[in-house]
Amino acid sequence: MPDKPTKEKLMEQLKGGIIVSCQALPGEPLYSETGGIMPLMAKAAQEAGAVGIRANSVRDIKEIQAITDLPIIGIIKKDYPPQEPFITATMTEVDQLAALNIAVIAMDCTKRDRHDGLDIASFIRQVKEKYPNQLLMADISTFDEGLVAHQAGIDFVGTTLSGYTPYSRQEAGPDVALIEALCKAGIAVIAEGKIHSPEEAKKINDLGVAGIVVGGAITRPKEIAERFIEALKS
Protein backbone atom coordinates (compact mmCIF):
# COMPACT_ATOMS: atom_id res chain seq x y z
CA MET A 1 0.00 0.00 0.00
CA PRO A 2 1.59 3.33 -1.06
CA ASP A 3 2.13 6.20 1.35
CA LYS A 4 -0.54 8.88 1.35
CA PRO A 5 0.38 11.62 -1.12
CA THR A 6 0.51 15.29 -0.20
CA LYS A 7 -2.01 17.55 -1.90
CA GLU A 8 0.69 18.91 -4.21
CA LYS A 9 1.92 15.43 -5.14
CA LEU A 10 -1.60 14.18 -5.78
CA MET A 11 -2.41 17.18 -7.97
CA GLU A 12 0.66 16.35 -10.05
CA GLN A 13 -0.58 12.77 -10.43
CA LEU A 14 -4.13 13.75 -11.37
CA LYS A 15 -3.38 16.65 -13.72
CA GLY A 16 -4.58 16.04 -17.25
CA GLY A 17 -5.85 12.54 -16.51
CA ILE A 18 -9.05 10.65 -15.81
CA ILE A 19 -10.13 9.23 -12.45
CA VAL A 20 -12.47 6.32 -13.09
CA SER A 21 -15.35 5.78 -10.68
CA CYS A 22 -15.87 2.04 -10.11
CA GLN A 23 -19.11 1.57 -8.19
CA ALA A 24 -22.16 -0.67 -8.15
CA LEU A 25 -24.94 -0.56 -5.58
CA PRO A 26 -27.37 -3.33 -4.57
CA GLY A 27 -30.00 -3.74 -7.29
CA GLU A 28 -27.61 -2.75 -10.09
CA PRO A 29 -26.47 -5.35 -12.67
CA LEU A 30 -22.79 -5.29 -11.68
CA TYR A 31 -23.39 -5.51 -7.94
CA SER A 32 -22.29 -8.77 -6.34
CA GLU A 33 -22.83 -9.79 -2.72
CA THR A 34 -19.50 -11.58 -2.81
CA GLY A 35 -17.54 -8.74 -4.43
CA GLY A 36 -14.84 -9.26 -7.02
CA ILE A 37 -16.31 -7.16 -9.83
CA MET A 38 -15.18 -3.62 -9.01
CA PRO A 39 -11.48 -4.55 -8.80
CA LEU A 40 -11.79 -5.87 -12.37
CA MET A 41 -13.20 -2.50 -13.40
CA ALA A 42 -10.32 -0.79 -11.62
CA LYS A 43 -7.82 -3.07 -13.35
CA ALA A 44 -9.30 -2.20 -16.74
CA ALA A 45 -9.16 1.51 -15.85
CA GLN A 46 -5.52 1.21 -14.82
CA GLU A 47 -4.60 -0.61 -18.03
CA ALA A 48 -6.31 2.17 -19.99
CA GLY A 49 -4.13 4.76 -18.25
CA ALA A 50 -6.44 6.13 -15.55
CA VAL A 51 -4.71 8.28 -12.92
CA GLY A 52 -7.01 7.37 -10.03
CA ILE A 53 -10.05 5.41 -8.88
CA ARG A 54 -13.17 6.52 -7.02
CA ALA A 55 -14.76 3.67 -5.08
CA ASN A 56 -17.55 3.00 -2.60
CA SER A 57 -17.49 0.76 0.49
CA VAL A 58 -14.74 -0.71 2.63
CA ARG A 59 -14.97 -4.05 0.83
CA ASP A 60 -14.62 -2.66 -2.68
CA ILE A 61 -11.79 -0.33 -1.68
CA LYS A 62 -9.81 -3.14 -0.04
CA GLU A 63 -10.28 -5.33 -3.12
CA ILE A 64 -9.17 -2.50 -5.41
CA GLN A 65 -6.13 -1.76 -3.22
CA ALA A 66 -5.08 -5.39 -3.66
CA ILE A 67 -4.70 -4.98 -7.42
CA THR A 68 -3.60 -1.36 -7.95
CA ASP A 69 -1.49 1.37 -6.37
CA LEU A 70 -3.49 4.11 -8.08
CA PRO A 71 -4.70 6.82 -5.67
CA ILE A 72 -8.22 6.14 -4.45
CA ILE A 73 -10.98 8.61 -3.66
CA GLY A 74 -13.08 6.66 -1.20
CA ILE A 75 -16.68 7.04 -0.12
CA ILE A 76 -19.22 5.07 1.85
CA LYS A 77 -22.80 5.38 0.69
CA LYS A 78 -25.23 4.86 3.55
CA ASP A 79 -28.76 6.21 3.89
CA TYR A 80 -29.77 8.11 7.01
CA PRO A 81 -33.48 8.79 6.46
CA PRO A 82 -35.23 11.14 6.62
CA GLN A 83 -32.12 13.22 5.86
CA GLU A 84 -30.95 13.12 2.24
CA PRO A 85 -27.11 13.16 2.46
CA PHE A 86 -25.77 9.61 2.06
CA ILE A 87 -22.20 9.96 0.74
CA THR A 88 -19.86 9.61 3.75
CA ALA A 89 -22.52 11.41 5.74
CA THR A 90 -21.18 11.04 9.30
CA MET A 91 -17.92 10.65 11.21
CA THR A 92 -18.59 6.90 11.46
CA GLU A 93 -18.02 6.51 7.71
CA VAL A 94 -15.03 8.86 7.82
CA ASP A 95 -13.45 6.69 10.53
CA GLN A 96 -13.94 3.55 8.42
CA LEU A 97 -12.37 5.18 5.36
CA ALA A 98 -9.49 6.76 7.29
CA ALA A 99 -8.48 3.28 8.48
CA LEU A 100 -7.92 2.23 4.84
CA ASN A 101 -5.06 4.69 4.24
CA ILE A 102 -6.56 5.98 0.98
CA ALA A 103 -5.46 9.17 -0.78
CA VAL A 104 -8.75 11.09 -0.48
CA ILE A 105 -11.98 10.78 1.47
CA ALA A 106 -14.98 12.35 -0.27
CA MET A 107 -18.08 13.40 1.64
CA ASP A 108 -21.40 15.13 1.12
CA CYS A 109 -20.88 18.85 1.68
CA THR A 110 -24.25 20.13 0.50
CA LYS A 111 -26.32 22.51 2.60
CA ARG A 112 -29.04 19.91 3.18
CA ASP A 113 -30.00 18.87 6.70
CA ARG A 114 -27.58 16.27 8.06
CA HIS A 115 -28.12 13.22 10.25
CA ASP A 116 -25.52 14.49 12.74
CA GLY A 117 -27.16 17.93 12.92
CA LEU A 118 -23.90 19.73 12.08
CA ASP A 119 -23.44 22.48 9.53
CA ILE A 120 -20.96 21.49 6.85
CA ALA A 121 -18.17 23.84 7.94
CA SER A 122 -18.25 22.35 11.44
CA PHE A 123 -18.18 18.81 10.06
CA ILE A 124 -15.17 19.55 7.84
CA ARG A 125 -13.30 21.16 10.72
CA GLN A 126 -14.02 18.16 12.96
CA VAL A 127 -12.72 15.74 10.34
CA LYS A 128 -9.61 17.87 9.72
CA GLU A 129 -8.93 18.04 13.44
CA LYS A 130 -9.26 14.28 13.85
CA TYR A 131 -7.34 13.39 10.67
CA PRO A 132 -5.01 16.33 9.91
CA ASN A 133 -3.01 14.42 7.28
CA GLN A 134 -6.02 13.08 5.38
CA LEU A 135 -6.92 14.76 2.09
CA LEU A 136 -10.63 15.53 1.81
CA MET A 137 -12.99 16.16 -1.09
CA ALA A 138 -16.31 17.97 -0.79
CA ASP A 139 -19.12 16.63 -2.97
CA ILE A 140 -21.22 19.74 -3.64
CA SER A 141 -24.02 20.91 -5.94
CA THR A 142 -23.66 24.72 -6.06
CA PHE A 143 -20.98 27.39 -6.08
CA ASP A 144 -21.89 28.61 -2.58
CA GLU A 145 -21.54 25.09 -1.16
CA GLY A 146 -18.13 24.79 -2.77
CA LEU A 147 -17.04 28.11 -1.35
CA VAL A 148 -18.17 27.19 2.17
CA ALA A 149 -16.26 23.90 1.99
CA HIS A 150 -13.16 25.62 0.60
CA GLN A 151 -13.21 28.23 3.34
CA ALA A 152 -13.60 25.48 5.96
CA GLY A 153 -10.35 23.91 4.79
CA ILE A 154 -11.39 21.21 2.34
CA ASP A 155 -8.64 20.12 -0.07
CA PHE A 156 -10.72 19.49 -3.19
CA VAL A 157 -14.20 20.50 -4.28
CA GLY A 158 -16.10 18.04 -6.46
CA THR A 159 -19.12 18.98 -8.57
CA THR A 160 -20.51 15.48 -7.99
CA LEU A 161 -23.96 16.47 -6.75
CA SER A 162 -24.91 19.23 -9.20
CA GLY A 163 -28.33 18.23 -10.53
CA TYR A 164 -28.88 15.81 -7.66
CA THR A 165 -30.17 18.39 -5.17
CA PRO A 166 -33.51 20.08 -5.90
CA TYR A 167 -32.01 23.58 -5.78
CA SER A 168 -29.00 22.98 -8.05
CA ARG A 169 -28.77 23.39 -11.82
CA GLN A 170 -30.59 20.56 -13.60
CA GLU A 171 -28.77 19.57 -16.78
CA ALA A 172 -28.39 16.39 -18.82
CA GLY A 173 -24.63 16.91 -19.05
CA PRO A 174 -21.87 18.22 -16.80
CA ASP A 175 -22.33 21.54 -14.99
CA VAL A 176 -19.60 23.35 -16.89
CA ALA A 177 -20.66 26.75 -15.55
CA LEU A 178 -20.21 25.57 -11.96
CA ILE A 179 -16.85 23.96 -12.72
CA GLU A 180 -15.63 27.13 -14.41
CA ALA A 181 -16.83 29.42 -11.60
CA LEU A 182 -15.10 27.32 -8.93
CA CYS A 183 -11.86 27.23 -10.93
CA LYS A 184 -11.95 31.00 -11.38
CA ALA A 185 -12.36 31.36 -7.60
CA GLY A 186 -9.00 29.64 -7.15
CA ILE A 187 -10.47 26.40 -5.79
CA ALA A 188 -8.95 22.98 -6.54
CA VAL A 189 -11.82 21.41 -8.47
CA ILE A 190 -12.39 17.75 -9.20
CA ALA A 191 -15.01 17.79 -11.94
CA GLU A 192 -17.51 14.97 -11.60
CA GLY A 193 -21.05 14.24 -12.67
CA LYS A 194 -22.70 13.49 -16.02
CA ILE A 195 -19.48 13.61 -18.04
CA HIS A 196 -20.57 11.34 -20.88
CA SER A 197 -17.99 11.83 -23.63
CA PRO A 198 -14.25 12.34 -24.21
CA GLU A 199 -15.11 15.68 -25.81
CA GLU A 200 -16.81 16.89 -22.62
CA ALA A 201 -13.83 15.72 -20.56
CA LYS A 202 -11.42 17.60 -22.84
CA LYS A 203 -13.48 20.79 -22.59
CA ILE A 204 -13.55 20.51 -18.80
CA ASN A 205 -9.82 19.77 -18.58
CA ASP A 206 -9.13 22.99 -20.48
CA LEU A 207 -10.83 24.95 -17.67
CA GLY A 208 -7.92 24.16 -15.35
CA VAL A 209 -9.47 21.57 -13.05
CA ALA A 210 -7.36 19.58 -10.59
CA GLY A 211 -8.95 16.32 -11.73
CA ILE A 212 -11.82 14.72 -13.65
CA VAL A 213 -13.93 11.78 -12.48
CA VAL A 214 -15.85 9.73 -15.04
CA GLY A 215 -18.07 6.91 -13.85
CA GLY A 216 -21.24 5.89 -15.66
CA ALA A 217 -19.84 6.51 -19.14
CA ILE A 218 -17.09 3.96 -18.47
CA THR A 219 -18.16 1.51 -15.76
CA ARG A 220 -21.94 1.21 -15.99
CA PRO A 221 -22.71 -0.94 -19.06
CA LYS A 222 -26.48 -0.74 -18.55
CA GLU A 223 -26.31 3.07 -18.67
CA ILE A 224 -24.02 2.98 -21.71
CA ALA A 225 -26.33 0.58 -23.55
CA GLU A 226 -29.40 2.67 -22.70
CA ARG A 227 -27.78 5.73 -24.25
CA PHE A 228 -27.26 3.90 -27.55
CA ILE A 229 -30.78 2.44 -27.49
CA GLU A 230 -32.42 5.79 -26.73
CA ALA A 231 -30.46 7.45 -29.53
CA LEU A 232 -31.99 5.08 -32.07
CA LYS A 233 -35.49 5.83 -30.81
CA SER A 234 -35.19 9.59 -31.23
From Swiss-Prot:
Lineage: Bacteria, Bacillati, Bacillota, Bacilli, Lactobacillales
Catalytic EC class: isomerase
Keyword Isomerase: yes
Catalytic activity line of the entry: an N-acyl-D-glucosamine 6-phosphate = an N-acyl-D-mannosamine 6-phosphate
GO terms under biological process: carbohydrate metabolic process; N-acetylmannosamine catabolic process; N-acetylneuraminate catabolic process
Entry superkingdom: Bacteria
GO annotations of cellular component type: cytosol
Pathway: Amino-sugar metabolism; N-acetylneuraminate degradation; D-fructose 6-phosphate from N-acetylneuraminate: step 3/5
Organism for this UniProt entry: Streptococcus pyogenes serotype M1
Protein name as annotated: Putative N-acetylmannosamine-6-phosphate 2-epimerase
CDD domains, per the entry: NanE
Protein encoded by which gene: nanE
NCBIfam families reported for this sequence: PRK01130.1
Coiled-coil segments on the chain, per record: none
Family classification: Belongs to the NanE family.
GO molecular function terms noted in the UniProt entry: N-acylglucosamine-6-phosphate 2-epimerase activity
Function noted in UniProt: Converts N-acetylmannosamine-6-phosphate (ManNAc-6-P) to N-acetylglucosamine-6-phosphate (GlcNAc-6-P).
Keywords per UniProt: Carbohydrate metabolism, Isomerase
EC numbers, comma separated: 5.1.3.9
